């Protein structure tokens, strides 16, 4: 039996040796290789995880940066929109303010127009009245000048200075002139006292013209009488 066992053991050993020889690798070496493979795979797994984590972190950081960049333009757009709305609100407010001064400017202009119209309306009646007054005063002055210039009183006053013998005729001329001149003076006084109306001025002008026309024949007759008396006085002196 023992011999059989020895023989079998030898055979087994021989078989193992043959296998080792065939493989050329010992089991220890196989185990070491397997351990190294396991370690390498584990290390690779760890490195992969690290790389994935880094990639995830990088991706998250990139996403955060992208989100920030996206949010920044959005915030700028919102700010610009807010500024635009405030500017538009301020623009109508400022636009309404100039409108109010414009309205306020329109009211003084309207007031000025009303004052100008009232002034023109007042000046329009005053201008004809003043022109009528001037015309009436000019007519009265012309009438008084004509009456005073044509009155025989001045001539009667000059005649006594030149010729003394005519003193007898002078009082009659003076009395006649005194009788005529008060009428002209009364007419002139009435013309000045009466208001400057068209009817009053026309009537006064007609009265003055009639008074002047009445005085002119009398004065011409007196002048003719004075001329006739002058040769008689010259003959007496001669």
Swiss-Prot record:
Residue span(s) of domain IQ: 31-60
Organism: Macaca fascicularis (Crab-eating macaque)
Positions of post-translational Phosphoserine modification: 41, 151, 153-154, 202-203
Function (record text): This protein is associated with nerve growth. It is a major component of the motile 'growth cones' that form the tips of elongating axons. Plays a role in axonal and dendritic filopodia induction.
Cited CDD domains: IQCD
Protein name: Neuromodulin
CC annotations in GO: cytoplasm; dendrite; filopodium membrane; growth cone membrane; perikaryon; postsynaptic density
Subcellular location: Cell membrane; Cell projection, Growth cone membrane; Synapse; Cell projection, Filopodium membrane
């Amino acid at each position: 039996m023992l011999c059989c066992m020895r023989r079998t053991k030898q055979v087994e050993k021989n078989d193992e040796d043959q296998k080792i020889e065939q493989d050329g690798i010992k089991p220890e070496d196989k185990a070491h290789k397997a351990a190294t493979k396991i370690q390498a795979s584990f290390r690779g797994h760890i490195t992969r995880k690290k790389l994935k984590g880094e990639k995830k972190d990088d991706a998250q950081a990139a996403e955060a940066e992208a989100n920030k960049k996206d949010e920044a333009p959005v915030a700028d757009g919102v700010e610009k929109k807010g500024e635009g709305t405030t500017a538009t609100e301020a623009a109508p407010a400022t636009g309404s303010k100039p409108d109010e001064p414009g309205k306020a400017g329109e009211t003084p202009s309207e007031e000025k127009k009303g004052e100008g119209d009232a002034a023109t309306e007042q000046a329009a009646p005053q201008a004809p009245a003043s022109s009528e007054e001037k015309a009436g005063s000019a007519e009265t002055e012309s009438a008084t000048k004509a009456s005073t210039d044509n009155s025989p009183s001045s001539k009667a006053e000059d005649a006594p200075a030149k010729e003394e013998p005519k003193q007898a005729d002078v009082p009659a001329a003076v009395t006649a002139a005194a009788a005529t001149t008060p009428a002209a003076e009364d007419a002139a006084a009435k013309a000045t006292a009466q208001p400057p109306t068209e009817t009053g001025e026309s009537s006064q002008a007609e009265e003055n013209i009639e008074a002047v026309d009445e005085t002119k024949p009398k004065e011409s007759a007196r002048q003719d009488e004075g001329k006739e008396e002058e040769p008689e006085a010259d003959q007496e002196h001669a």
